């Protein structure tokens, strides 16, 4: 057994427990060089101790290698379990975050749908009210214009009727005066032709002849006046027929205009419904895309994603229907 670590003193064996000093040096070693048992005994003990030390060292190294291998295996298993648990924890956290995200999106979607429905209902109510008011204004304006035209046509017909009556009366008076003048001239000529003597003797006959001529002239004047009245009545009837035909045409035009207005209003309602539907779909698409951008790129600052989803353009001024241009001519 080795007493110290410097290998200077050795023990022979466990029985004698004799301490063997180290080998001599120099002359002493040469002097005892021939003494084989001492030399053999000394190196045998040292070799045994060296072999034991080597065996012990190898055993310790083997144990250390085994321990190191077990430690490496245990460490690998621990790291594998840690990675697996970390992966499971990350997957669980992602699933929980995804579930929360879906719930939040569903809540936002329901709120947005509710807001859109309220805004759509309000907009439709206002639009229908505006359309109703606009149609009432257009109908009132059309009725006023039609009444004004009818009144103007009736005034023109009345004026033409009065002018025709005045003209017929003037012509009757002129014809009657011409007839009376002609009869007077004819009577004067007859009187002149009968001679002066006949005038003196036959005053009564001349007076009677004058009365007869005047009666005949009054009859002719009555006949002419009656004919003129019949002609005037025919002219008035013709004017009345023309007036009725014009009035009927105007009423037909008014009915056609009202039908066109109703058709235009119906088409306007259909186009407005399509516009509302497309506007709602466009708003939903833009909001969904904006949410996708916000959730996909949460670190983007405001304005960095405008090239992906630019702002909507304003309605051109030439497409805006002003209220003062909606009335029909």
UniProtKB/Swiss-Prot annotation:
This protein's UniProt keywords: Coiled coil
Coiled coil (residue ranges): 57-120, 225-251
Domain of life according to the entry: Eukaryota
Protein name: Uncharacterized protein C6orf163
